[in-house]
A protein has these predicted regions:
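A late C-terminal transmembrane helix in Major Facilitator Superfamily
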Residues: 148, 327-359
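Extracytoplasmic gate region of multi-pass secondary transporters
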Residues: 30-34, 208-259
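C-terminal transmembrane helical hairpin of 12-TM major facilitator-type secondary transporters
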Residues: 253-257, 271-320
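Symmetry-related core transmembrane helices of the 12-TM Major Facilitator Superfamily/SLC fold
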Residues: 166-184, 363-380
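Extracytoplasmic
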Residues: 10-45, 62-66, 152, 226-233
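Helix-to-loop junctions at the C-terminal end of transmembrane segments
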Residues: 62-74, 260-273, 356
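Conserved MFS/SLC helix-loop-helix module at the cytosolic interface between two early adjacent transmembrane helices
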Residues: 61-99
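Intracellular juxtamembrane helix-capping segments at the cytosolic ends
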Residues: 115-129, 312-325
Length: 384
């Protein structure tokens, strides 16, 4: 039975809000809480970031299982379970009395990340809407694109008011009181709406070449995204921007991502996702050329181009596998496609940080080069 348009809007709003909480309470926590966490154990903050990197590797191992489970039974139960796992991991952090428990808490959060972030949400929408999930996928990324906008200030407020342990406990309670009920609002099973053009029951197996190319694209673009998230201010200062300009330019990435997703929702949705993905992948290399060519004054242009490309690529990671390979087995396939990306993402801050320390601004050619390779890989993928 077709889901009413109003119900469709509520599903996107509920899942997008739950995703905002998931990202804000995991991916964006270390930027605010790593230093006080480490200080309470007499450790360097690098240990907390190391624990977070471990969590991303854990999420890579969980993702394929979670995706396959969503393919079989729908996403509602898996996403609800992810909220319980997130809450448990955050609670372990809140009561951790030793570095071992700190790492254990992050490992549990990594399980929650593998079950409850974008890949699981995209698979849930594919189970409900089939090949018509592109619009809803864009919708939840529009909402969750504000995760850092919400998460960093809220984590900072809880830290300043109560402390880092209470901040972790606060996020755990938010999962139980808000995110879990929102995910419970989702349809049970795979309540598929009928597509305007019915999908075939079975088609030829996906091209192994296309799968490998797509896995490569996802891995290197996630590497670039994470490297820039960790080191953008330092990179822009190496180009000649002042500290204030670097911070101000960095603040433009979030709005650029959201603006690009609005463009995808309004204009680019008329085209095959490969078209928008190719344009998006070329944005970072173009931004790098601007930064090297014009130095510090190009900081804003770099941030806007990188942010816009990253915003559309986030959507493409959900829509491209759906458009190329269909919705059958989508969740498991998405989990496997993103597993290398999570591992490389975990290493990105260390690798690019070392390159920036050794080469200064010229380190940008590392990310520009692999961004160009991603564009070439996307050009090598054919719609059929």
């Amino acid at each position: 039975m077709r889901l009413p348009p109003a119900r469709k809007g509520w599903i996107v709003a509920a899942l997008g809000t739950a995703q905002t909480i998931g990202w804000a309470s995991s991916y964006y926590v270390p930027a605010v809480l790593a230093a006080p966490m480490a200080a309470s154990f007499d450790l360097s903050p690098v240990w907390v970031f190391g624990a977070f990197s471990m969590a991303m590797v854990v999420s890579a191992t969980v993702g394929p299982w979670a995706g396959a489970r969503i393919d079989r039974i729908g996403g509602r139960g898996v996403l609800i379970l992810s909220n319980l796992v997130f809450a448990a991991g955050l609670a372990v952090l809140a009561v951790a009395g030793s570095p071992g428990l700190l790492f254990l808490g992050w490992a549990v959060i990594g399980i929650g990340m593998g079950m409850g972030l974008y890949e699981a949400a995209f698979a849930t929408l594919a189970g409900i809407y089939g090949k018509e999930a592109r619009g809803p996928i864009t919708g939840i990324t529009l909402i969750a694109g504000f995760a850092s906008t919400v998460g960093w200030p809220l984590s900072g407020l809880m830290l300043a008011t109560w402390g880092w342990r209470e901040a972790c406990l606060g996020w755990a309670l938010i999962h139980l009181a808000l995110a879990l009920p929102l995910n419970a609002f989702l349809p049970k099973g795979t309540e598929r709406i009928p597509a305007e053009t019915p999908e075939p029951a079975a088609g030829p197996p996906p091209s192994r070449r296309a799968l490998w190319l797509l896995a490569f694209v996802f891995a290197v673009t996630w590497f670039n995204s994470t490297a820039m998230a960790a080191h953008l201010p330092g990179l822009l200062q190496a180009a000649g921007a002042s500290s204030a300009m670097a911070i101000a330019a960095g603040a433009m990435i979030g709005p650029a991502q959201v603006a690009a997703r609005v463009l995808e929702f309004g204009l680019l949705r008329r085209f095959h996702p490969l078209i928008s993905a190719r344009l998006a992948a070329s944005a970072h290399p173009l931004a790098a050329v601007c930064l090297v060519g014009f130095g510090g004054p190009a900081a804003y242009a770099f941030a806007l181009l990188h942010g816009a490309g990253n915003g559309i690529l986030t959507i493409a990671k959900g829509t491209l596998p759906l458009a190329l390979f269909g919705s059958a087995g989508y969740g498991a396939r998405l989990g496997w496609l993103n597993a290398p990306a999570r591992v490389l993402q975990a290493a990105a801050p260390l690798i690019f940080g070392a390159a920036l320390a050794a080469w200064g601004l010229q380190a940008i050619w590392l990310t520009a080069g692999i961004g160009a390779l991603a564009t070439l890989a996307l050009l090598a993928i054919r719609r059929g």
